[in-house]
């Protein structure tokens, strides 16, 4: 029987001495995962900008002047080319996002075709397209989509301070439609929106107490984009962020905890502590929308220092020439990459 986390239990985790918490998180992590492997995903924006939503952190919203260049839905050849390069760079999952409130019916056949073509390449697929109804979710699942990303962002109580054009319940309905279709769920949140510790606690409770816990949980650190209402938000204290990763690992022991947006602001030591706390997945690519992301070469160097192996590679350290091959093949157009937290 699945454990239901209570408010009091979760508060107690947050109150634990830091090293005790880290020890417990690492214990849980080792029960379910090889601590020396990491899952790598790559994201591509297949339709950029002009989103009608008012998410206060998002440069894709049409309501804010961020200088983001609008791009129509990409041609399938462009998408497949990026997917191939991502696979050659070590990614096992190719994620695609479109800046929509929800996909239009006229676009569904095209989306289904994209999924099928990428699946033929031997990669897992994930999409984030906004809210879905049950029929749309079933079509994507039938096309072979493995994961659907739809973040809760924050707690139910704080949510209306961030977004007014989509309700919290709509997000939960979408997650239910995704789960009912047979797809796997990717859902997490953003830290640094101005929320209090209580909101962080409630977000993790909401995620962990879903009928089935998300297979993938991206934890984002707010990327402050000039022109958005959150451009001047306070920075997140690194140890607070590491603590959230550790609590997420304990509460969702079998989920992949993804170190997501904001990673470019973390030094190697902070990232290493996040991995020690139970993070075992990253977004890998030159750029996350308008914000920077660690270069592939730097990521590979960090993996080597930490003896971390990409999940789709052999369980031995990559040889020097293999690293060089991956680095060489990872030169992808930087402006096509974005952060899944934006949808």
Swiss-Prot record:
Its EC number is 2.8.1.6. Gene3D superfamilies: Aldolase class I. [2Fe-2S] cluster binds at residues 95, 126, 186, 258. GO terms for molecular function: 2 iron, 2 sulfur cluster binding; 4 iron, 4 sulfur cluster binding; biotin synthase activity; iron ion binding. One of its GO terms (biological process) is biotin biosynthetic process. Binds 1 [4Fe-4S] cluster. The cluster is coordinated with 3 cysteines and an exchangeable S-adenosyl-L-methionine. It catalyses: (4R,5S)-dethiobiotin + (sulfur carrier)-SH + 2 reduced [2Fe-2S]-[ferredoxin] + 2 S-adenosyl-L-methionine = (sulfur carrier)-H + biotin + 2 5'-deoxyadenosine + 2 L-methionine + 2 oxidized [2Fe-2S]-[ferredoxin]. Residues 36-254 form the Radical SAM core domain. Signal peptide: none annotated. [4Fe-4S] cluster binds at residues 51, 55, 58. Pathway: Cofactor biosynthesis; biotin biosynthesis; biotin from 7,8-diaminononanoate: step 2/2. Belongs to the radical SAM superfamily. Biotin synthase family. This is Biotin synthase. The gene is bioB.
């Amino acid at each position: 029987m699945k454990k239901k986390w209570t408010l009091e239990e979760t508060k107690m985790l947050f109150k634990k001495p830091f090293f005790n918490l880290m020890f417990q998180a690492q214990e849980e992590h080792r029960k379910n995962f090889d601590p020396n492997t990491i899952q790598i995903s790559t994201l591509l924006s297949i339709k950029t900008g002009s989103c009608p939503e008012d998410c206060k952190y998002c440069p894709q919203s049409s309501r804010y002047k961020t200088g983001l260049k609008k791009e129509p839905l990409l041609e399938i050849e462009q998408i497949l080319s990026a997917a191939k390069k991502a696979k050659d760079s070590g990614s096992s999952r190719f994620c695609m996002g479109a800046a929509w409130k929800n996909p239009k019916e006229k676009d569904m056949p095209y989306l289904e075709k994209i999924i099928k073509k990428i699946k033929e390449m031997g990669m897992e697929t994930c999409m984030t397209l906004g809210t879905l109804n049950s029929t749309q979710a079933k079509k994507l699942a039938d096309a072979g989509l493995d994961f659907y990303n739809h973040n809760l962002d924050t707690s139910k109580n704080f949510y209306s301070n961030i977004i007014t054009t989509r309700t919290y319940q709509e997000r939960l309905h979408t997650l239910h439609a995704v789960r009912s279709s047979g797809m796997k769920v990717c859902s997490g949140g953003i830290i640094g929106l101005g929320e209090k510790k209580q909101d962080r606690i409630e977000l993790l409770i909401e995620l962990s107490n879903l009928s089935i816990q998300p297979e993938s949980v991206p934890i984002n650190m707010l990327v402050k984009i000039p022109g958005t209402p959150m451009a001047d938000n306070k920075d997140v204290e690194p140890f607070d962020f590491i603590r959230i990763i550790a609590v997420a690992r304990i509460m969702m022991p079998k989920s992949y905890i993804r170190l997501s947006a904001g990673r470019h602001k973390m030094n190697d030591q902070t990232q290493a502590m996040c991995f020690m706390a139970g993070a075992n997945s990253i977004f890998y690519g030159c750029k996350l929308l308008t914000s920077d992301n660690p270069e592939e070469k730097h990521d590979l160097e960090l993996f080597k220092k930490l003896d971390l192996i990409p999940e789709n590679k052999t369980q031995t350290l990559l040889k020097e020439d293999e690293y060089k091959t991956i680095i060489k093949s990872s030169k992808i157009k930087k402006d096509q990459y974005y952060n899944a937290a934006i949808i």
